[in-house]
Regions:
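RecA-like helicase/translocase P-loop NTPase motor core
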Residues: 1-178
């Protein structure tokens, strides 16, 4: 059973547990044949999570780019930072690419930032051409949603459930009988 479901009937109330509202945003970038995979970007609520501090983990040494904000959402500033770094990489490699993206509110082109955007001026994209998918078609037209992202979510949930199972097994094993 998944961690967000229960065997209680709808009219019954389940006491002692709340639904976990922990959120992460992960975004991945890959070319059409999968030969060029970029580092995934992970957005979390905490700038330095307790688990990182306890384990003395430096996210800069990870194979991902770690960012944080209050709601763990993709924001225009993070989007522009991502585009700037990708543009620099393409410039260094002497490549020009087409980047297909959805039309999320944070995915404004750098030359037209949203009115409420107050961050640094976005980079000029001279090695990236942005192509936006039409509204409400992401699930059908974006191959990452159907394959890679689905697999990533399934793997994350599997590891999460396994981790919770190990914790519960440990707790039950050490309980004393009355």
């Amino acid at each position: 059973m998944r961690p967000d479901s229960t065997i209680a009937r709808k009219i019954e109330t389940v006491r002692g547990a709340k639904k976990n509202k922990t959120r992460l945003t992960v975004f991945v970038t890959v070319n059409s044949d999968g030969s060029d995979k970029r580092r995934a970007w992970l957005i979390n609520k905490s700038k330095t999570p307790v688990a990182f501090r306890k384990a003395k983990i430096n996210p800069d040494n990870w194979p991902i780019v770690y960012k944080s904000n209050k709601k763990a959402w993709m924001l225009s500033g993070i989007w522009y930072e991502f585009l700037g770094k990708l543009n620099e990489d393409m410039k260094a490699q002497g490549r020009h690419i087409a980047l297909v993206t959805d039309n999320a509110p944070t995915h404004h082109p750098p030359e037209k930032p949203p009115i409420e955007y107050t961050g640094p001026k976005p980079s000029v994209l001279d090695h990236i051409t942005l192509f936006y998918l039409p509204p409400n078609t992401t699930a059908w037209l974006q191959p990452l949603d159907a394959g890679i992202i689905r697999y990533l979510n399934a793997g994350y949930r599997r590891r999460y459930v396994t981790h919770i199972g190990h914790q519960q097994k440990f707790r039950l094993h050490h309980m004393r009988q009355p």
